[in-house]
Amino acid sequence: MKESILDVLLYLFEHYFSEDADLVRDRDSLQNGLIQAGFSPAEISKAFDWLDALSEQRPSVARPHVDGPVRIYHGPELDKLDVDCRGFLLFLEQHRILDADQRELVLDRAMALDQDELDLDDLKWVVLMVLFNQPGAEAAYAWMETQMFLDEPESVH
């Protein structure tokens, strides 16, 4: 049996969402497919709750990128996100892949995962899922998706 919410989310993303964004499946058929893949109903339910929270937090209008204050991490965020993760989020924001609202959404969704710590690869998947769900973020999503599968990350100009 697979154990974490992130495992369920990654499976959904890799097998359903990224293949055909227009594919509409009802929750029951997705749940049956996930159970057949070996996920527990409890983890599947948590993953759907995670996705529901993500879709509820979708901004209605994309705002232009503006330079804002530097994000200061605290307590549980420092425990869950190591220096590589925090540096990566700063990199994405400085290179306008994420805006401040999207960064906060990534942080919210990362903190909602049932893991004590996230590594950089896990955080990249969270970023990719958030960007996939953001209207107007197609270019940022495409750049991020490319970065996920390159051996050596490409710089942003």
UniProtKB/Swiss-Prot annotation:
Source organism, top-level taxon: Bacteria
Cited Pfam families: DUF494
InterPro entries from the UniProt entry: Smg
UniProt record similarity statement: Belongs to the Smg family.
HAMAP family recorded: Smg (MF_00598)
NCBIfam families hit by this protein: PRK03430.1 (NF002897)
Protein name in UniProt: Protein Smg homolog
Gene giving rise to this polypeptide: smg
